[in-house]
Amino acid sequence: MKISDVVVELFREAAIYLPEDVKNALEEAYKKESSEISKNTLKAIIENNKIAEETQVPLCQDTGVPIVFLKIGKNINSSEIMKIIEEIKEGVKKATEEVPLRPNVVHPLTRENFKTNVGLNSPFINIEFDESLDREIEIIAFPKGAGSENMSALKMLKPSDGIEGIKNFVLETIANAGGKPCPPIVVGIGIGGTADVALKLAKKALLRKIGERHRDKEIANLEKELLEKINSLGIGAMGLGGDITALDVFIEIAGCHTASLPVGICIQCWADRRAIKRIKLDAKL
């Protein structure tokens, strides 16, 4: 199977099927929710997902912008990497037509629609190298809707603001977002690096499965504390008030300048869509 065909199937899977961990988290949220209106909203979300699977149509009308996380193993040369990138672009074009995906990607100033979700650096491909893979690549399709993406935030805190400053910024951001990102949400937080790195870490944090804690115990405890505090805000499903505002909180960190404390926040809606595939490359790509 060509890489472009794999990309089509990954975006089809991501658009139609929620990952099992997300489905289970929504079911748990439904059981725990005490607000009748939020409980009914969660019930509607769960039923919506079943209908999407049965009818093979995307589970949300906003099929997002196409984001790809690409891991490249060893023994893959630069010309092969360029070929892989072209195959990913071709796959996004085909997926837009075949799944179908809504053609969301437009010119930022003229608002001209590219019709294919490909153009001006889209799809957005994040590349990293992994020596544990030998002539293998890993592709994660990660469609991202506008409602949650528009609630992203970045703040360059003072180092003296410390952990309390980070907590306050996160809670202020979620409180101000309210129902706009279509809760129950998943919250990705990037701490450290530079401004751009913090936001990239926050986006990457959203790739984790619900319940998957950070390997550093201190960070893991901060994730749990923030989840509890966010759910105490009472925003509830779709902002209608309730116990469950977030399904999980994930944090990623990086070293930063001694005079900086960047914090990036990326929010994912209840439709926490992602699909992953590893591919062993042929002798000649």
Swiss-Prot record:
Keywords: 4Fe-4S, Iron, Iron-sulfur, Lyase, Metal-binding. GO terms for molecular function: 4 iron, 4 sulfur cluster binding; fumarate hydratase activity; L(+)-tartrate dehydratase activity; metal ion binding. The keyword Metal-binding applies. It is an enzyme of class 4 (lyase). It catalyses: (2R,3R)-tartrate = oxaloacetate + H2O. InterPro entries: Class-I_Fumarase/Tartrate_DH, Fe-S_hydro-lyase_TtdA-typ_cat. Transmembrane segments: none annotated. Iron-sulfur cluster binds at residues 60, 182, 269. Its cofactor is iron-sulfur cluster. It holds the Pfam family Fumerase. It comes from the Archaea. One of its GO terms (biological process) is tricarboxylic acid cycle. One of its GO terms (cellular component) is cytosol. Its EC number is 4.2.1.32. PANTHER family: FUMARATE HYDRATASE-RELATED, L(+)-TARTRATE DEHYDRATASE SUBUNIT ALPHA-RELATED. Tetramer of two alpha and two beta subunits. Belongs to the class-I fumarase family. This is Putative L(+)-tartrate dehydratase subunit alpha. It comes from Methanocaldococcus jannaschii (strain ATCC 43067 / DSM 2661 / JAL-1 / JCM 10045 / NBRC 100440).
